[in-house]
Structures are given as C-alpha cells and as structure tokens.
C-alpha cells in the first residue's frame, strides 16, 4: 500500500465516504416520511416527475426518492433498506458496478435506482440471466412499484407481440439478456413501425453483470435463416476422424512428428499436419468426395475443408457431458461458466452439425446469419448502464476498459466471518476424491451441510458415484437435473445435507442455513397456520444445529480458470454474517494444471510427493495457482478485446444500416431519397460508357444503349441525339436520360396513384436492403474466418479486415442503389383495360386449345401457332406489354415469333 493510499484511502474508500454523507441525509428524512399517509407517500411519484419537468436533476431528488422507496418497502414488503443497500443504490444510479456479497439483498437494492431513473419516463430494463429470476424478481418487487404508481413488465421468451409491447411500455421491465438482444435484432428486421417492440434504450441495470458482460461477451446473438442442406457431407466426413492420430507437438525443423493433427487446448482449435492432410485427401478421393490430384486447401475445396475441420474439432475438443449433453435426440450446449443448459443455442461454423453427426443424432441444416450483435455492443447502446454482482473486483479493469464502468465494492451489512482454508494439492484425481469424501463424511457426522462445486456434468457424476459407493446420501444439481434447481437449493442448508453442483448452478438463489421453510410451505396445498408455525419451529431448530456445526461448508473439486468463478462458489457460504467455511481440493491432473503449467513445473511438483496419497499445502502452491489463473484471465481478456475490435467494425456498419432502416420505417414518403439515388445510379452507369472529361472517340454509345435497354428497359436513340445535336456533352446527356426516366416513372405513378407508389417504393427499398445486408453478413463471416492468413504476408489482419470490410460495405450500398432503381424502373404497371384485355386473350386461347387440342407453352400458357397468327394482325407497340399476359414486353414475347415468321 502506497503512502498516499494510507493517508487518503483507496479510490473505493473515498467513493464510499462521499456516499455515506448522502445516507445520513436519507436517514434524517425517515421520521418525516414515516408520518406520511399512504396517499401522501404515493403522491410523491407525481411530485418528483413534476420537479424533473421543472428542471431539477435526478441527483437533486435522489435523497427524497430513496427515502420514499425505503418507506414504501417497509409498508408493502415488510423490508427496510439497510444503509449499505442505500449506498449500493446510489452507486447504481451512475455508470458503475456495485459488488455486493451473496445474501446482501441485491434484489431489494435494485428497487432504489429503478424507481429513481424510471421517473424520467424513458423506461428501465432490469436484466437477469434466466427466465426464472426475471419472473421471480418482478413478482417480488411488483407490489412495491405499483404502490408508488409505477408499472412493471416481464419480457421472457414465448410472449405474444401484444404482451411483449406491453412489457416494454412499462416503467420498469424485467427481462433476460438474450431476449433483450434478440428483440433489438427483431426490431431491425421489422417491416412496419407497428411491428417494433423496444423504445429508447435508456437505462439497463444488469444483475450478475460479470456473467452477462464477461462470460457471455464472446457469444454473439444471431437470428438466422436456413442455408443449403449439407447434412450428408457431415455424416460422411464423421467416419474419417476416428482414424486420425493426435500429434503432441507441432512440426518444427528440429521435431518432425508422426501424428495427423495437433490441438491448441487454450483456443480450442485443431490443425492438420502435412501427414494428416495427405491422409484426409486420400480418404476423400477414395470416397469420391474429391477428384484425384486436387488439394484440400484449393479454393474450390473450401467447403470440404470446412467440414473436415468442424468434424475434427467435434471429436477432439468437445466432450459429451462436459461441453454438451444429448437430450431427446438433440445436442444441448452446457454453459461452461454456470453449468446450465442453453436450450435453443447452437454452435456456429458447422461445429454443431459435426457434433450431431458424431453423436448419431439427426443432423440439422446449417443456418445463414440474417442479423447479429454481440452482448458487448448491445449493452453499449444504452444511455446509462450499471450492474450488480457478488464478484466483480477481479474483472474491474475489463469493465473499465470495455464498458467504461467503475467497480465499487459495497461493505457488508454484518462482518463476514467465513473461514477460507488453504488449498490442498494431491498427486492424482483418485487421491483427491478420497480426501473429498473423507471431508464430506466428517461434515455429515457433525450435521454440517456441504456444497460441493464441480466444473462439469461428467465430474459431478463421477463424484456422485463415489458418494453412492461410500453410502452418503446427496443431491446432484447439474445441467441434466436443472428442472429441480430451486428445490435442491432450498434443501441445501439442511443439517447433514450434501449437494453437488456444477460450477455455479443455483446462482441467484440463496442457500438458507437450516433449510428454506417458505419453500416447504409452498409445497403444501392451502397450509394452515399451525402447519406454517410447525415448519418455522422446525427451521429454527435446524438453523441452530447448522450454526453450531459451523454453517455451510464449501468444497471446490478443482480451481476454475477464473478466480471470479472460484469466489462465486465460496460466496455461497457466510451470507449476512453467518458462519461458514471453504476449501479447494486440487490434483496435478486438473485441467488448469495440465493446460497452463509447463512440463518443468509439473515435474517439480510431482517430485514433491514422496508418499502415496499425501496432501500438499504451501504458499508456493497458492502462488503457482494464482499465476496460472492470471495467465488464463489475461488470455481470455485479450480474446474478448480482440473480438470486440473486430465486432466494432461490423457494429459501425450495423449502426448505419439500422439507422437507414429505421428512417425508412418512420417515413411513409421516401420519394426524395429515390430521386437522389436515381441520379447517382444513372450517373454511374453513364460514366462507365462516357468517362468524364473524355473525347467523343472514347465514348461507347452502343454499349450504353444496350445497357439501358437490358437493365432499365429504356429504349433510347442516343446515337440519333448526338447526330442531331453536336453540343450534347456528357452532363447534359445524363440530365436528359434522367429526365426521361423520371417522366416514365411519373407516368406509372399517375396510373396507380401516389400513395400506392410511395408504399411500393418503401417495400422495394426495405426488401432489397434486407437481402443485401444478409449477403453482406455472410461475406463478413467468411472474411473474418480467413483474415488471419494475411499475417503470413506481413500485414496486420485487423487493418486488412477494416479495409476489406469497408470496401465490401461501400459495394453493398452501391448495389442497393442500383437494384432499387432497376426494380422501380423496370416495374410494369397494368391499367384496368390492359388486365381485362389480357384476360379476354387468355379465354380465347383456352377455347382454341380445347377445340384443337394443341400443345401448350409452359411459360406463356398459350399455344405457339395460333397466338402468332392471332397477334400478327393487330398493331401492338414493340415495348407494350404482350396481350398474352406473360408479363413480358411484346418484342420479347410473341412479337419475336411474328418477326421470325
């Protein structure tokens, strides 16, 4: 600690000192607010809104608003906000993260900033990690907010459009992070203003902010449509992978390996060796999937390479019951941070299909991205962002760097007395499991409840089998049993209860020492007062037993890659000043040790074990683990930052497209825009055939006439114009062509009416924009996947990505203009008379077909011989619509046949 810190305190201490002065103000107001009637207290909401309209700021009314919420909470919920919760609420009104320990009442704390900021009328979004927590928190706080005249909405999957709009229209909306992100994307795929759900993104309060903004940061939200089906190719390539042999190290000048592929466990990537490439190519040729003499890395075989690499990763880097589970014939992803299943989510780049083929379930079609955004960029759209969690301080630097959020550690209401014991290391996993079981036995005998944290479904099941063998009764909470989550967590605090939980499954629900009597009462149908009193008495007895036994004991079966996840596990114990203890059991076979410690350190540690099954505790061990975790955290931070830098490029483009799209939706008349881009398009076309500042000999008039005819359906005698007028230069020529195009367009508009044409313009523009944006996203995906190869040419991949994506984006915008004008210029408008005439012609032709039994042309649905004879006698203009009703011009339809005859 520096001398300045000793004198002035840390930044966190200085912030807390300042906020405590506000707490004193709020506490002084309490007697006055207690004296208010319910109606007077309710009237405060309108008073605050009026004061804000009159020019006061949120900070000026904060003390009174917080005093109002505290008093209303006492009357409605029977809960009074502690001083530390008031501090937490003040932190959350700014762009800050409040780190509040488990059990300190984050749900109640959130009511303070939500009420205050909702007074502005812009809407408040309270973001949770799952549907259960969104519903639970909304229902818990709804009576309080409604008492104060605030409406509450819940936005979860499965709502109807009307329910969703009502949820977003509420003053305070509880929602999951994924649903908010997807609704944003859906709004930007809407075809009318009425289809949109979200209003201005004003204030988001993110619960478990570390889980959403850090753990989920690398997960993009994608709305997709089906691409072409290549499931058979995945099934075929799947048969190849088991024959490939792993090579421990990559080939170098000194080392030439014997294997077919190498693995990078840190980044979860697989690479074929030269030998592996030859083996794969031989197999593909044998199977008839690739012609002889071709290479897997040739541009024409890029799809095959994509399938091979996806299958290789599926077999070597993704484990069943660790990364995913198979449920009801489907592959369901398991969240590596929470241990929860993520139904509905699929891995991209063909990985999900490759795993489906590996597990022998139905292989679904690949998807094409229609719209996407990362959580990082979605939450940065909010005017105000704040978050709460029990563990943020370890990631404070990242929150500041990426989101501009300062982390403030809120003191606990009561001192924390949990006993965090030194880690214990064993030589192998079996010795470690033996020690864990002995620790659990000791706790069960003393009637102390135990929560055992594992890092995967597989490990939780291994430990469960070992406990069954030892005759220890226990509950398992992992991705396979998540439906019973609330029930298992409610029982985890009973005396002698043993609960195995994958990572942080059950996070968001407190483990109450002695069990949860309210959860037991909820199981009873219409419980009597006597039954409730009996449950309370039973709980008090159990609570006393558990307190004497030392509170909840936490056992970690191995260290996670992140210190934050370890702290979350420990944080389940010692809530609100309760006793508790924690200990991590480790082995040299743990993933963290194998992947992130070099062989030299591992060998040194192996030599330290001289007796089989002995445990090792030392300060050096703690340093080694801290060093490994710091490396991993830095690696993942760099990965997230790198991803954001790439996504920022796409984000700028996304912002521009969505802004343009919203402008289209909000305006019923875009004729000025159409006129402007018509000029641009014709100028661009003419410049290709008549270059600016060029000599007349360089002009390609014939080419220009053909282009205007083919693309825009305009038959213009430009050669004649030039012969008739020697002074006609490129600018005046362009003006004349645009004038004619506008004149023809106005004639069409006169036929259908102004409103119909405006509606049509808007529809064409939206449809073309959506189609081109979808194609652009696919191109960006391909560019992103291969851009790292530019590094071999001594070029910076990020800079190259920026340049290439900008070029692609400008090309897309040019294509948008061109396609819109082409469509609008070529569109045919039929008058009522033409439609009636075409119908008569069809009926006549049908009668002749019936009489003569002549063959029918599939395209025009009319006979060839009779129609040419029929129409040759009539005087029809070459550019008029063919009366047969085919939709083509007469010269391109039956007129051409007349000419041939």
From Swiss-Prot:
Oligomeric form and interacting partners: Monomer and homodimer. Part of the essential Sec protein translocation apparatus which comprises SecA, SecYEG and auxiliary proteins SecDF-YajC and YidC.
Principal subcellular localisation of the protein: membrane
Residue numbers binding ATP: 85, 103-107, 510
Similarity section: Belongs to the SecA family.
Protein name as it appears in the record: Protein translocase subunit SecA
Biased composition (Polar residues): 849-866
Intracellular or extracellular location(s): Cell inner membrane; Cytoplasm
Organism per entry: Haemophilus influenzae (strain 86-028NP)
Alphabetized GO MF terms: ATP binding; metal ion binding; protein-exporting ATPase activity
Feature: compositional bias, Basic residues: 888-901
Function, as annotated: Part of the Sec protein translocase complex. Interacts with the SecYEG preprotein conducting channel. Has a central role in coupling the hydrolysis of ATP to the transfer of proteins into and across the cell membrane, serving both as a receptor for the preprotein-SecB complex and as an ATP-driven molecular motor driving the stepwise translocation of polypeptide chains across the membrane.
EC number: 7.4.2.8
Region (Disordered): 848-901
Paired cysteines (S-S): none
Encoding gene (name): secA
Cofactor note: May bind 1 zinc ion per subunit.
Alphabetical UniProt keywords: ATP-binding, Cell inner membrane, Cell membrane, Cytoplasm, Membrane, Metal-binding, Nucleotide-binding, Protein transport, Translocase, Translocation, Transport, Zinc
Keyword Nucleotide-binding tagged: yes
CDD domains xref list: DEXDc_SecA (cd17928), SF2_C_secA (cd18803)
């Amino acid at each position: 600690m520096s001398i300045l810190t000793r004198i002035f305190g840390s930044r966190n201490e200085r912030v807390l000192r300042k906020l405590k002065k506000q707490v004193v103000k709020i506490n002084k107001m309490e007697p006055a607010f207690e004296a208010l009637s319910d109606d007077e207290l309710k009237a405060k909401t309108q008073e605050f809104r009026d004061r804000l309209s009159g020019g006061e700021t949120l900070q000026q009314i904060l003390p009174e608003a917080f005093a109002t919420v505290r008093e209303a909470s006492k009357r409605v919920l029977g809960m009074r906000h502690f001083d530390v919760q008031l501090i937490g609420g003040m932190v959350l009104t700014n762009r800050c993260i409040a780190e509040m320990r488990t059990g300190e009442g984050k749900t109640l704390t959130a009511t303070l900033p939500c009420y205050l900021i909702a007074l502005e009328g812009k809407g408040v979004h309270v973001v949770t990690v799952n549907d259960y927590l969104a519903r639970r928190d909304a229902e818990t706080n709804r009576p309080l907010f409604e008492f104060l005249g605030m409406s509450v909405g819940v936005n979860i999957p499965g709502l109807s459009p009307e329910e969703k709009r009502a949820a977003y229209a509420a003053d305070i909306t509880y929602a999951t992070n994924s649903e908010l992100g997807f609704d944003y994307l859906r709004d930007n795929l809407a075809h009318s203003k009425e289809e949109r759900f979200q209003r201005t993104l004003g204030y988001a309060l993110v619960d478990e902010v570390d889980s959403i903004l850090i753990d989920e940061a690398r997960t993009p939200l994608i709305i997709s449509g089906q691409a072409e089906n290549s499931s058979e190719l995945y099934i075929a390539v799947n048969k190849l992978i088991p024959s490939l042999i792993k090579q421990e190290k990559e080939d170098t000048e000194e080392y030439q390996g014997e294997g077919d592929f190498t693995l990078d466990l840190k980044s979860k990537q697989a690479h074929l060796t030269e030998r592996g490439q030859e083996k794969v190519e031989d197999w593909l040729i044998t199977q008839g999937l690739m012609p002889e003499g071709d290479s897997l890395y040739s541009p024409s075989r890029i799809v095959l390479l994509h399938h091979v690499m996806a299958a290789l990763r599926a077999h070597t880097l993704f484990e069943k019951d660790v990364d995913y589970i198979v449920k009801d014939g489907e592959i369901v992803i398991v969240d590596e941070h929470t241990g929860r299943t993520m139904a509905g989510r699929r891995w991209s780049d063909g990985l999900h299909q490759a795993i489906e083929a590996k597990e022998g379930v139905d292989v679904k079609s690949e998807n094409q991205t229609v719209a996407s955004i990362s959580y990082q960029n979605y939450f940065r759209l909010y005017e105000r962002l704040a978050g709460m969690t029990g563990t943020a301080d370890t990631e404070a630097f990242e929150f500041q760097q990426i989101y501009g959020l300062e982390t403030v550690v809120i003191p606990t209401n009561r001192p924390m007395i949990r006993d965090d014991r030194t880690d214990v290391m064993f030589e192998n996993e079996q010795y470690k499991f033996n020690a864990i079981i002995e620790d659990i036995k000791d706790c069960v005998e003393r009637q102390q409840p135990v929560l055992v944290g594992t890092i995967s479904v597989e490990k939780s099941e291994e430990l469960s089998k070992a406990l069954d063998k030892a005759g220890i009764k226990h509950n398992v909470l992992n991705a396979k049993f998540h439906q019973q989550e609330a029930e298992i967590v409610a029982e985890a605090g009973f005396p002698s209860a043993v609960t195995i939980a994958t990572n942080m499954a059950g996070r968001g629900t407190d483990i109450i020492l002695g069990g949860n009597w309210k959860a037991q009462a909820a199981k009873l149908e219409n419980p009597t007062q006597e039954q409730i009193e009996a449950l309370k008495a039973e709980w008090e007895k159990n609570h006393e037993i558990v307190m004497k036994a030392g509170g909840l004991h936490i056992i970690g079966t191995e260290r996670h890659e992140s210190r934050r996840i370890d702290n979350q596990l420990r944080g389940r114990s010692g809530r609100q000043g309760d006793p508790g203890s924690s200990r991590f059991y480790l082995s040299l076979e743990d993933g963290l040790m194998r992947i992130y410690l070099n062989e030299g350190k591992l060998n040194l540690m192996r030599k330290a074990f001289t007796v089989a099954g002995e445990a090792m505790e030392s300060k050096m061990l703690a340093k080694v683990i801290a060093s490994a975790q710091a490396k991993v955290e830095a690696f993942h931070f760099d990965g997230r930052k790198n991803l954001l830098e790439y996504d920022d490029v796409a984000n700028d483009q996304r912002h521009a497209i969505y802004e343009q799209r919203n402008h289209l939706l909000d305006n019923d008349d875009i004729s000025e825009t159409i006129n402007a881009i018509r000029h641009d398009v014709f100028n661009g076309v003419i410049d290709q055939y008549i270059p600016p500042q060029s000599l007349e000999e360089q002009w390609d008039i014939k080419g220009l006439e053909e282009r205007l005819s083919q693309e825009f359906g305009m038959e213009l005698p430009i050669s004649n114009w030039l012969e008739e007028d020697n002074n006609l230069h490129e600018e005046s020529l362009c003006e004349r062509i645009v004038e004619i195009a506008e004149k023809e367009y106005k004639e069409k508009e006169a036929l259908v009416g102004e409103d119909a044409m405006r509606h049509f313009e808007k529809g064409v523009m939206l449809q073309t924009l959506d189609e081109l944006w979808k194609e652009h996203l696919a191109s960006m995906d391909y560019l992103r996947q291969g851009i790292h190869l530019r590094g071999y040419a001594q070029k910076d991949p990020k800079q190259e990505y920026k340049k290439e994506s900008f070029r692609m984006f400008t090309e897309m915008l040019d294509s948008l203009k061109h396609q819109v004008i082409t469509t609008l210029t070529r569109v045919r408008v039929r008058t009522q008379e033409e439609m009636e005439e075409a119908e008569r012609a069809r009926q006549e032709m049908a009668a002749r077909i019936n009489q003569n039994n002549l063959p029918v042309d599939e395209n025009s649905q009319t006979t060839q011989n009779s129609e040419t004879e029929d129409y040759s006698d009539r005087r029809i203009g070459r550019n008029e619509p063919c009366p047969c009703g085919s939709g083509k011009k007469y010269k391109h339809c039956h007129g051409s046949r007349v000419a041939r005859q």
